[in-house]
Amino acid sequence: MRQILIAVAVALTVSILLTPALIRLFTRQGFGHHTREDGPPTHHAKRGTPSMGGVAIIAGIWAGYLGTHLAGLAFDGEGISASGLLVLGLATVLGIVGFLDDLIKIRRSRNLGLNKTAKTIGQVAAAVLFGVLALGFRNANGLTPASADLSYVREIATVTLAPGLFVLFCVVVVSAWSNAVNFTDGLDGLAAGSMAMVTAAYVLITFWQYRNACVTAPGLGCYNVRDPLDLAIVAAATAGACIGFLWWNAAPAKIFMGDTGSLALGGIIAGISVTSRTEILAVVLGSLFVAEVSSVVLQILTFRTTGRRVFRMAPFHHHFELAGWAETTVIIRFWLLTAIACGLGVALFYGEWLAAIGA
């Protein structure tokens, strides 16, 4: 537990201290945000707000993770694992793709960065590399970071994917989550606050998997997850980094995370869900992100087939703004929905364990 607390504390401290330094640096360099011309009128006042704040989030996560393991040397904590590094590596590569996207937007003074093809190639490359490596690194107990079995709370043995299909599955999961968080990052603090809650839920889930691992506590309801404690540390560091960033990103935002942060955070959800064997449960925990990306897909499909729009504007948080809701009202209500979804997800996880032990 102390490793988790250290991860939160270090990540939060680094993020909350580094973010204002980035605000000053990006302001001097003119790295300002460019709003959508067709966006809500209230958003035009945000033009010029520093972007690429995701750098602070990624730095905070890495600092929390590495700092925890350095501190662990003093009290014989578990070392760095393949699962933890794979998740962080995936998030970092996606963060680099997002950084390039943000940089092009700034250089060209418009709200369009990398073209869709280049951005998709970056996401797919990161996902393929993650998927291939996740089925390797078998430990002494025969466990790999990921399982080819489709997973809800634990593997569904009746649905086993061939290696090639598993990699394709990872491409879908990574692309979906990175885009979902990216679309959600349209209001001050919405994505950061929601991510803090989702990763906090994952701290509870992965720590419970650690306490009930089949390797150390064999029996009914145990979990065959390779590195659950290290995943809990990654989740804790992410939650801490998001909270630290939220201090400056809360409305009215002093800085935005940009695609640098949103793509990286989407990678965190994708990576942890795959390595903790909870890909389906993640949809419940991250219901807000799922709803946001679904609203975009629905809007596009409906408009192309009928010429009409379902929402005033997509992602659908803008729909509520255009309906007259204040931005802060949308944010707080969406946070509440995320909290409910996370509570439901943790309850489903625990309920499955109770069922597994016959309670």
UniProtKB/Swiss-Prot annotation:
<comment type="pathway">
    <text>Cell wall biogenesis; peptidoglycan biosynthesis.</text>
</comment>
<keyword id="KW-0808">Transferase</keyword>
<feature type="transmembrane region" description="Helical">
    <location>
        <begin position="156"/>
        <end position="176"/>
    </location>
</feature>
<dbReference type="GO" id="GO:0071555">
    <property type="term" value="P:cell wall organization"/>
</dbReference>
<dbReference type="GO" id="GO:0046872">
    <property type="term" value="F:metal ion binding"/>
</dbReference>
<dbReference type="InterPro" id="IPR000715">
    <property type="entry name" value="Glycosyl_transferase_4"/>
</dbReference>
<keyword id="KW-0133">Cell shape</keyword>
<keyword id="KW-0472">Membrane</keyword>
<dbReference type="GO" id="GO:0051992">
    <property type="term" value="F:UDP-N-acetylmuramoyl-L-alanyl-D-glutamyl-meso-2,6-diaminopimelyl-D-alanyl-D-alanine:undecaprenyl-phosphate transferase activity"/>
</dbReference>
<feature type="transmembrane region" description="Helical">
    <location>
        <begin position="3"/>
        <end position="23"/>
    </location>
</feature>
<keyword id="KW-0460">Magnesium</keyword>
<feature type="transmembrane region" description="Helical">
    <location>
        <begin position="55"/>
        <end position="75"/>
    </location>
</feature>
<keyword id="KW-0573">Peptidoglycan synthesis</keyword>
<keyword id="KW-0961">Cell wall biogenesis/degradation</keyword>
<feature type="transmembrane region" description="Helical">
    <location>
        <begin position="280"/>
        <end position="300"/>
    </location>
</feature>
<dbReference type="InterPro" id="IPR018480">
    <property type="entry name" value="PNAcMuramoyl-5peptid_Trfase_CS"/>
</dbReference>
<dbReference type="GO" id="GO:0005886">
    <property type="term" value="C:plasma membrane"/>
</dbReference>
<comment type="similarity">
    <text>Belongs to the glycosyltransferase 4 family. MraY subfamily.</text>
</comment>
<keyword id="KW-0479">Metal-binding</keyword>
<dbReference type="GO" id="GO:0009252">
    <property type="term" value="P:peptidoglycan biosynthetic process"/>
</dbReference>
<dbReference type="GO" id="GO:0051301">
    <property type="term" value="P:cell division"/>
</dbReference>
<keyword id="KW-0812">Transmembrane</keyword>
<feature type="transmembrane region" description="Helical">
    <location>
        <begin position="334"/>
        <end position="354"/>
    </location>
</feature>
<dbReference type="GO" id="GO:0008360">
    <property type="term" value="P:regulation of cell shape"/>
</dbReference>
<feature type="transmembrane region" description="Helical">
    <location>
        <begin position="117"/>
        <end position="137"/>
    </location>
</feature>
<dbReference type="Pfam" id="PF10555">
    <property type="entry name" value="MraY_sig1"/>
</dbReference>
<feature type="transmembrane region" description="Helical">
    <location>
        <begin position="187"/>
        <end position="207"/>
    </location>
</feature>
<keyword id="KW-1003">Cell membrane</keyword>
<keyword id="KW-0132">Cell division</keyword>
<dbReference type="Pfam" id="PF00953">
    <property type="entry name" value="Glycos_transf_4"/>
</dbReference>
<dbReference type="InterPro" id="IPR003524">
    <property type="entry name" value="PNAcMuramoyl-5peptid_Trfase"/>
</dbReference>
<feature type="transmembrane region" description="Helical">
    <location>
        <begin position="255"/>
        <end position="275"/>
    </location>
</feature>
<comment type="function">
    <text>Catalyzes the initial step of the lipid cycle reactions in the biosynthesis of the cell wall peptidoglycan: transfers peptidoglycan precursor phospho-MurNAc-pentapeptide from UDP-MurNAc-pentapeptide onto the lipid carrier undecaprenyl phosphate, yielding undecaprenyl-pyrophosphoryl-MurNAc-pentapeptide, known as lipid I.</text>
</comment>
<feature type="transmembrane region" description="Helical">
    <location>
        <begin position="80"/>
        <end position="100"/>
    </location>
</feature>
<keyword id="KW-0131">Cell cycle</keyword>
<keyword id="KW-1133">Transmembrane helix</keyword>
<dbReference type="GO" id="GO:0008963">
    <property type="term" value="F:phospho-N-acetylmuramoyl-pentapeptide-transferase activity"/>
</dbReference>
<feature type="transmembrane region" description="Helical">
    <location>
        <begin position="231"/>
        <end position="251"/>
    </location>
</feature>
<protein>
    <recommendedName>
        <fullName>Phospho-N-acetylmuramoyl-pentapeptide-transferase</fullName>
        <ecNumber>2.7.8.13</ecNumber>
    </recommendedName>
</protein>
